[in-house]
């Protein structure tokens, strides 16, 4: 992989991992259309690490508060307000995707990586679901109103993100909106819920990478991938959280539909 490809894929990962438009779909479809070689596990680790760094940098205050709430909540659970229980709900919401990912991620990835038409269809189908969620429901709840039940439901929805074209942030935001949370709360909880999963994915892939080693020729592309995905991931988080305070998610809906339709045309007639 050359530095140009590493830069483009790093930018794509940074933007699409955070925005509700599916990073896996873009990272499969773009190299397919441009006839680039597969990036491989080494570069996947770099991209995940970059977006993980971006999320940690943006939410560092939240993470410190969550750590404090975790130990406080353990000491006196019954008398803690709901907001202090948030770290436990994030952990509970992480379990479904962690278990399903451990059991089926490789099978699902191999199945859908060879089916770009299905990926394009999922981009469209789950765009319509996001549109429905964005226009229905009360949307009155803030993140402090999260409960164990709602955290687990959103966590179960996150399992669908293993399918390329669904989008981790897209499906968790959709689930939260359908449960009555406002857009900002849905987006913020989606990002916080993604941190353990993104970290776990990076560590899991890194463990395999350490066994094989990193070829010297891959070092520069890896560093470029980490840097670009981190920078654009940070920008994307800031952009989305500001956007949801004043407008709907329909720009992402139309984008997903457009990309899905263009991909189907290219695949079938290109």
From Swiss-Prot:
Pfam families reported in the protein's UniProt record: BacA (PF02673)
Gene Ontology terms: cellular component: plasma membrane
Residues annotated as transmembrane: 14-34, 40-60, 88-108, 117-137, 146-166, 189-209, 221-241, 249-269
EC class name: hydrolase
Record flagged with keyword ATP-binding: no
UniProt superkingdom: Bacteria
GO biological process, one term: cell wall organization
Location within or outside the cell: Cell inner membrane
Residues in the signal sequence: none
Family note: Belongs to the UppP family.
HAMAP family in the cross-refs: Undec_diphosphatase
Stated name of the protein: Undecaprenyl-diphosphatase
């Amino acid at each position: 992989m050359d530095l140009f490809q590493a830069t483009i894929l790093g930018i794509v990962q940074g933007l699409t991992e955070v925005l509700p438009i599916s990073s896996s779909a873009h990272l499969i479809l773009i190299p397919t259309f441009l006839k680039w070689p597969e990036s491989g596990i080494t570069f996947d680790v770099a991209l995940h690490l970059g977006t993980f760094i971006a999320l940690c940098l943006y939410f560092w205050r939240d993470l410190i508060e969550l750590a404090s709430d975790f130990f406080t909540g353990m000491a006196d659970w019954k008398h803690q307000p709901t907001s202090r229980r948030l770290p436990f709900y994030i952990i509970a919401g992480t379990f479904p995707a962690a278990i399903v990912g451990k059991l089926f991620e490789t099978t699902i990835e191999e199945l859908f990586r060879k089916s770009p038409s299905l990926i394009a269809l999922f981009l469209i189908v789950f765009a319509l679901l996001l549109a429905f969620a964005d226009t229905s429901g009360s949307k009155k709840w803030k993140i402090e109103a999260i409960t164990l039940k709602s955290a687990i439901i959103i966590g179960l929805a996150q399992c669908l993100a293993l399918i390329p074209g669904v989008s981790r942030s897209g499906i968790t935001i959709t689930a939260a909106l359908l449960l009555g949370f406002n857009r900002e709360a849905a987006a913020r909880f989606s990002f916080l819920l993604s941190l353990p999963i993104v970290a776990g994915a990076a560590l899991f892939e890194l463990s395999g990478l350490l066994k094989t080693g990193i070829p010297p020729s891959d070092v520069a592309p890896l560093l470029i991938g980490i840097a670009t995905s981190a920078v654009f991931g940070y920008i994307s988080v800031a952009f989305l959280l500001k956007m949801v305070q004043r407008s709907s998610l329909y720009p992402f809906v139309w984008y997903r539909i457009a990309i899905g339709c263009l991909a189907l045309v290219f695949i079938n007639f290109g």
